[in-house]
């Protein structure tokens, strides 16, 4: 019988040099990828997904890692090849798309230059043939205006365009295996859907095998023929995608399917991996009666924040002699925010969500319109006058990695705003307050002296939340606060935000591109597109009967 396997991984083990074999980072990993097959490798951060991918390309540092087992690619054991033999395989036969295209692309070279460089290094083509090949691939990844695109630098194109460029780069040498390591994690759900469809189409047209790595099981199910579930360096379950969804055996697999917010029902609390795995979760559905009662309570009082006809534009200029273009970021925005409400702002990147948040915080000044907070017109205040209101309006950032100062420990990060406003000055009181805040966000006093690099993504975001609530604000703006996190960690952070809202009666402005998350969290939503509010209202009603095509597009993009 003919062997149809392109890649066979047999009993792969990876452990740190000088460590015990009993503490393997990858433990007895075995799987196959057939020719023209898409295999999904799914697990949480730290499960060993990326380590497996790097092992396949033999990119692990021999001084740091020891590997054993076999990785057979076209019947050659990759772990036994020389450097010259490996270099012939990397890029030519096995290619890789990375999670963060901005860090994978060279910021000092334009897109065309980077594509040409790869062709000259790996392919025996003349200049005309190289240009022809690049133009063909750019069309295949569905990018427009090729001539101008090739002149641009990475910072001048969107996240979705960067990822398409990365896909084009990965296909330049006609590989037979494409490893896609979290290629859609940082993207809007609509762009995510487009990239998934693009990979599916290219897999067929280019006769590719694909190893698609992700933390999102619902997303991988839409793409993969076979799914492998990995946890703590070991494979816990694998099988055909549809069978695995319908007949998952391992509690961990079932938990991965359950943590994403439901499109159909609203739960008081999202299931978490830990509770599902320990059979310790009982779903409590928010009934229509209870929801109506809660909404009546919120909207029976006057709003605490009112925005009237806010407009904001930016001037862009491509060169010294080019004419100025005006980009309208916000156009006649009107909204009311009520005490105890969670108001959702949802839309794709560039729709104006974050610009609106910045105008509320007076980081950006609007050109016209009013922002009234508890009777005070914020747009008329000077920077000094606004300081006392900044205590009341706090922000949780999207990226927990860049929002914390790497040189400051957790304790100092949390108490910094408290010291600035001189709420507490005694050192013992400040430390006690930091401990209280850590406990509020589900962390212990053991974290006080840790630095950001010693924390996981979820822990970093909890520290960011602790800092945001340290001043007892009235309004908290959550700007894509969970979009950089695994779906499993997302569920924990969303539960935490709702718990804190109940405890302290916070009012949230919840910004997201993911309508399923917004539906779970919000009492009311505004759908934004190109600086305009397309649609607004009760998210449950909008989900059932959206009025605008753009809203339908966002709903259809949910995995």
Model-assigned labels for residue ranges:
Residues 220-222, 518-520:
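A short, surface-exposed alpha-helical micro-motif characterized by mixed small hydrophobic
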Residues 152-157, 161, 451-455, 459:
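Conserved ABC ATPase signature
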């Amino acid at each position: 019988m003919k062997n149809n396997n392109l890649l066979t991984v047999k009993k792969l083990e990876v452990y740190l040099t000088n460590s015990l074999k009993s503490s393997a980072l990858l433990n007895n990993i075995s799987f196959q990828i057939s020719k023209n097959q898409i295999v999904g490798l799914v697990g949480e951060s730290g499960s060993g997904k990326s380590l497996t991918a790097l092992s396949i390309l033999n990119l692990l540092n021999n001084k740091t890692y020891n590997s054993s087992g076999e990785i057979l690619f076209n019947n050659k054991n990759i772990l036994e090849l020389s450097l010259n033999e490996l270099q012939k395989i990397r890029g030519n036969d096995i290619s890789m798309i990375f999670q963060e295209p901005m860090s994978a692309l060279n910021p000092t070279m334009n897109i065309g230059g980077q594509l040409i460089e790869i062709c000259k290094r790996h392919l025996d083509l003349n200049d005309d043939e190289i240009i022809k090949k690049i133009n063909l691939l750019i069309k295949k990844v569905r990018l427009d205006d090729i001539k101008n695109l090739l002149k641009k630098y990475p910072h001048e194109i969107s996240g979705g365009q960067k990822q398409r460029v990365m896909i084009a780069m990965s296909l330049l040498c006609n590989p037979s295996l494409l490893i896609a390591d979290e290629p859609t994690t940082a993207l809007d759900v609509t762009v995510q859907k487009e990239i998934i469809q693009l990979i599916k189409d290219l897999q067929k047209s280019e006769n590719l095998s694909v190893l698609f790595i992700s933390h999102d099981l619902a997303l991988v199910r839409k793409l993969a023929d076979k799914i492998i579930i990995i946890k703590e360096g070991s494979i816990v379950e694998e099988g055909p995608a549809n069978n695995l969804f319908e007949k998952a055996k391992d509690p961990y697999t079932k938990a991965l399917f359950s943590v994403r917010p439901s499109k159909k029902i609203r739960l008081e609390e999202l299931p978490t991996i830990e509770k599902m795995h320990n059979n310790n979760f009982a779903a409590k559905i928010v009934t229509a009666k209870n929801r109506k009662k809660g909404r009546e309570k919120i909207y029976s009082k006057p709003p605490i924040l009112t925005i009237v006809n806010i407009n904001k534009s930016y001037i862009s200029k491509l060169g010294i002699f080019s004419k100025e273009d005006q980009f309208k970021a916000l156009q006649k925005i009107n909204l009311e925010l009520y005490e105890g409400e969670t108001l959702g702002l949802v839309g794709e990147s560039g729709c104006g969500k974050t610009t609106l948040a910045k105008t509320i915080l007076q980081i950006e000044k609007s050109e016209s319109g009013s922002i009234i907070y508890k009777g005070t017109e914020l747009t008329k205040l000077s920077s000094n006058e606004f300081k006392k209101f900044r205590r009341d309006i706090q922000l949780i950032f999207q990226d927990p990695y860049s929002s914390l100062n790497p040189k400051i420990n957790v304790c100092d990060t949390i108490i910094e705003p408290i010291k600035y406003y001189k709420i507490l000055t005694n050192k013992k009181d400040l430390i006690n307050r930091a401990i209280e805040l850590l406990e509020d966000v589900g962390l212990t006093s053991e974290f006080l002296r840790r630095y950001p690099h010693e924390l996981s993504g979820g822990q970093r975001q909890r520290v960011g939340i602790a800092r945001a609530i340290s001043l007892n604000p009235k309004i908290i703006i959550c700007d894509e606060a969970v979009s950089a996190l695994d779906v499993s960690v997302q569920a924990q952070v969303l539960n935490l935000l709702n718990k804190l809202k109940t405890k302290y009666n916070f009012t949230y402005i919840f910004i997201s591109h993911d309508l399923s998350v917004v539906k779970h969290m919000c009492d009311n939503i505004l759908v934004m597109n190109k600086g305009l509010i397309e649609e607004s209202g009760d998210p449950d009603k909008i989900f059932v009967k959206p009025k605008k095509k753009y809203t339908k597009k966002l709903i259809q993009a949910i995995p």
